[in-house]
């Protein structure tokens, strides 16, 4: 058995702090992140883009199940700062509560510089065309941000799991993304994060450094390394089967 971790230890090390035997460490390989591509036929024409040929900021929570706080924070920034220079396109995701989708859509309908969709079957094209991305930092979205080299503002969840926060914190330290933590931006007695903090970050986002400006060896080599590891494992399997007198189909071979 082997353990393959689809990332890099300098970005996120899920084994850190675990008292694991050396045998486990020797079986562990970090592959790098999985490079994504826009699917054939999914490239967006200007007429199909949310704002035509105008740049936009993509706001996505992936599946969307716990994206309420992030969506509300970004939306309040646009509601209170009508001079935001770049419009926003919200993709709520299939798992955001339908009542919340309706509430957000009603607020968005009152704004000229915000549009939304519940879900799109080709989110890669929308992300690749965006001037910047606001996201929670789940694994799949991070792979898309890195693959399409988009300036990104990550708003990670901190409860009940810290996975997104830990990944985003380290990526910010490395200069790959910027991060805003809602709990750190709360003002007064309100638990809501300050819309002005978000509005400032949104204004700066399109001019933010893109991830490729930071050299991280092997960052997006995941698919290549997985293929290599599969070939190695298959070679071991074939060698093992040969030793017990079987060919690659598992049939018994004759011996004299």
Where are these regions (language model features)?
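Membrane-proximal helix-turn-helix segments that form the acceptor-binding/catalytic region
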Residues: 1-3
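Donor-nucleotide binding loops and adjacent catalytic segments primarily
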Residues: 8, 12, 18-19, 33-132
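Short, conserved active-site loop motifs that form the nucleotide-linked donor/cofactor pocket
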Residues: 28, 113-115, 177
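Thr-Gly-centered strand-to-loop micro-motif
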Residues: 60-61, 91, 135-136, 155-158, ...
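A donor-sugar binding/catalytic signature common to diverse glycosyltransferases
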Residues: 121-165
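Nucleotide-sugar donor-binding patch of glycosyltransferase catalytic domains
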Residues: 151-207
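C-terminal amphipathic helix plus adjacent low-complexity
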Residues: 196-256
């Amino acid at each position: 058995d082997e353990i393959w971790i689809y990332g890099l230890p300098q970005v996120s090390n899920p084994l850190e702090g675990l008292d694991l035997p050396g045998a486990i460490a020797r079986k562990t390989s970090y592959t790098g992140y999985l490079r994504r591509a826009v699917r054939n036929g999914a490239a967006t024409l200007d007429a199909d883009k949310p704002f035509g040929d105008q740049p936009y900021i993509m706001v996505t929570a992936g599946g969307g199940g716990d994206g309420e706080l992030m969506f509300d924070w970004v939306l309040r920034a646009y509601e209170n700062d009508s001079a935001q220079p770049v419009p926003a396109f919200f993709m709520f995701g299939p798992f955001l509560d339908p009542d919340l989708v309706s509430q957000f859509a009603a607020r968005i309908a009152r704004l000229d510089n915000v549009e939304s969709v519940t879900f799109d079957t080709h989110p890669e094209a929308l992300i690749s065309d965006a001037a910047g991305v606001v996201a929670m930092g789940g694994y799949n979205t991070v792979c898309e941000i890195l693959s399409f080299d988009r300036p990104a503002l990550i708003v990670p969840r901190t409860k009940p799991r810290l996975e997104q926060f830990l990944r985003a914190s380290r990526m910010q330290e490395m200069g790959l993304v910027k991060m805003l933590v809602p709990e750190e931006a709360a003002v007064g007695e309100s638990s809501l994060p300050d819309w002005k903090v978000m509005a400032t970050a949104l204004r700066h986002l399109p001019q933010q450094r893109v991830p490729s400006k930071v050299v991280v060896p092997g960052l997006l080599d995941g698919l290549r390394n997985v293929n290599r590891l599969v070939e190695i494992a298959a070679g071991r399997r074939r060698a093992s089967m040969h030793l017990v007198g079987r060919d690659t189909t598992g049939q018994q071979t004759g011996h004299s």
